[in-house]
């Protein structure tokens, strides 16, 4: 769920996802459209695409146990882990959620 994702970001990237990425660029936060503004925004784009491929459970709500046998929950954990690692590995610039009218990139 989103709270677990926040905790994972804090553990891996040593920063708050809610504070820094909840309205960053074209894809961090709710929804998403246009072209990612930078590498950090692309982390959110890839995360959105990853969640979009998870069809048998809802990745945003409910408790996810990453070590379990549920393949859907394992995929959610992997989506979140990849995004948190991506945030850690890319520079944060504050790009507000504006000028995102371009055609969206395909997943």
Curated annotation (Swiss-Prot):
Q: Name one GO molecular function term.
A: calcium-dependent phospholipase A2 activity
Q: How is the cofactor bound?
A: Binds 1 Ca(2+) ion.
Q: Where does Ca(2+) bind?
A: 27, 29, 31, 48
User: What domain of life does the native source organism fall in?
Assistant: Eukaryota
What EC number is given for this enzyme? 3.1.1.4
Q: Which reaction does it catalyse?
A: a 1,2-diacyl-sn-glycero-3-phosphocholine + H2O = a 1-acyl-sn-glycero-3-phosphocholine + a fatty acid + H(+)
| UniProt note on tissues of expression | Expressed by the venom gland.
The record's PROSITE patterns line, in alphabetical order, gives: PA2_ASP, PA2_HIS
Which cysteines pair up through disulfides? They are 26-100, 28-44, 43-86, 49-107, 50-79, 57-72, 66-77
List the catalytic residues.
47, 80
Location in the cell reads: Secreted
Q: Which GO terms describe its biological process?
A: arachidonate secretion; lipid catabolic process; negative regulation of T cell proliferation; phospholipid metabolic process
- Cofactor(s), names only, from the UniProt record: Ca(2+)
Q: Describe the protein's quaternary organization and the partners it interacts with.
A: Monomer.
Function per UniProt: Snake venom phospholipase A2 (PLA2) that induces significant edematogenic activity. Shows mild cytotoxicity on Trypanosoma cruzi and Leishmania infantum. Also inhibits ADP- and collagen-induced platelet aggregation. Does not show myotoxic activity.
Q: What name goes with this protein?
A: Acidic phospholipase A2 braziliase-I
């Amino acid at each position: 769920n989103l709270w677990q994702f926040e905790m994972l970001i804090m553990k891996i990237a040593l920063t708050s996802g809610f504070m820094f990425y909840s309205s960053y660029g074209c894809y961090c936060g709710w929804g998403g459209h246009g072209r990612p503004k930078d590498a950090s925004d692309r982390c959110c784009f890839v995360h959105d695409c990853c969640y979009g491929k998870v069809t048998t459970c809802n990745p945003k709500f409910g408790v996810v146990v990453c070590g379990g046998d549920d393949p859907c929950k394992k995929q959610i954990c992997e989506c979140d882990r990849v995004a948190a690692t991506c945030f850690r590995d890319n520079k944060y610039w504050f790009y507000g959620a504006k000028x995102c009218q371009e055609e969206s990139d395909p997943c």
